[in-house]
Amino acid sequence: MNAEIMAVGSELLLGQIANTNGQFISKQLASIGVDVYRHTVVGDNEDRLKIALQEAYERADLVILTGGLGPTKDDLTKETVAAFCGKRLVYDENALHEIEDYFKRHNRVMTPNNKKQAYVIEGCTVLANRHGMAPGMLCELEDGKKLALLPGPPSEMKPMFVNELLPKLLGATEQTEITSRVLHFFGIGESQLETDLLDLIATQTNPTIAPLAGDGEVKLRLTVKHADKNEAARLLDETETLIRKRVGSYLYGYNETTLVKETFLRLQASGLTIASAESLTAGLFSSELAAFAGASHVLKGSVTAYSNELKQQLLQVSSATLASDGAISEACALEMARGVKTLYGSDIAISFTGVAGPGVQEGHEAGTVFLALLLPGGKERVYTLSLSGGRNAVRMRAVKFGYFYLLEELKRSNGSK
């Protein structure tokens, strides 16, 4: 079965609200093996809604519409679908009682126009709304295709979809499921990753491989159709192995994770503590780590030192280094890390110094970053980065590289992949 999702509401086209319903429905349909081929957004206009509905109906086995079921004049979904199906709107006493009870529970006066919500399309299956007023509907047409109407507010739509519509769709779908595994990469661009995996992406059909980019990282979503979970795991593992052979050095995690989360969990599991000295990043590194419960057992402290005076006073950066190499240098980054490690007595220390932009500073172009990492056993690492983007992009990407390099070192020290 394939489906299309249609969101109805001029407020969506105007950008006043986001269409989160589409994402939710797509995930739910994917979990039961229904392919979603298209998302459409239509304003509160009967003629345009008719055209969009006709086009979607010709392409899909199932069309799900959200929104436009309310009591006002611009709520046109129900009327438009009824006309499309050649059906009448009929009064549903149960729906009316539910609406009346809703007003009573909330101590509100029911206005006459709310009775409009008790009308449903003749012959459809009514989907109860336990969290609002407008009932949903599932219309099954003579050619076997289906039209589902759901309310627009996510607080009403989601429970109605899960509790009312989904069980009815399960009986009509093939006994296949869709399982996805998301691989997270850092330190490689989307175009380079795709180039390295181009033949795999082009030839893989089950699982499929889809690159996803965002927030300075790249993800690969592996999606497999299956009737057996063990078979799905085997297919995903085989494909992941092929990917790892080519770009495994950039892989850092799976599914719902982040660089910060993976690093925090590694630090927590190893019992190691860290401190940061931040000039360029002004506390961004420590702030992200502090967002996790239990951070106090991992994060010893942080020093934000933009001025050279504070670098000398708090982090013991030597005046000789500042005079010869400058504050934006490998030498300064290393002394900053040593200073903060001594100050807090941490197992690990990290430091950031550089040029966020927009201009040149100490002869360095915007985007130049020096990052130092001090590790247990006396290991010292210094990295030089050349990052693109505006001030905030440079600072955020510098922090991500800091977490990536730290995570790689933690993995190596534990002997894990």
From Swiss-Prot:
Q: Which Pfam family name is an example for this entry?
A: MoCF_biosynth
* UniProt cross-references to CDD domains, sorted A to Z: cinA (cd00885)
What SUPFAM superfamilies has UniProt attached to this entry? Answer: CinA-like, Molybdenum cofactor biosynthesis proteins
Q: Which domain of life is it from?
A: Bacteria
Q: Which HAMAP family match?
A: CinA_B
Q: Which family does it belong to?
A: Belongs to the CinA family.
NCBIfam families, alphabetically?
A: cinA_nterm, molyb_syn, PncC_domain, PRK00549.1
Q: What is this protein called?
A: Putative competence-damage inducible protein
Organism the protein comes from: Shouchella clausii (strain KSM-K16)
**Gene designation:** cinA
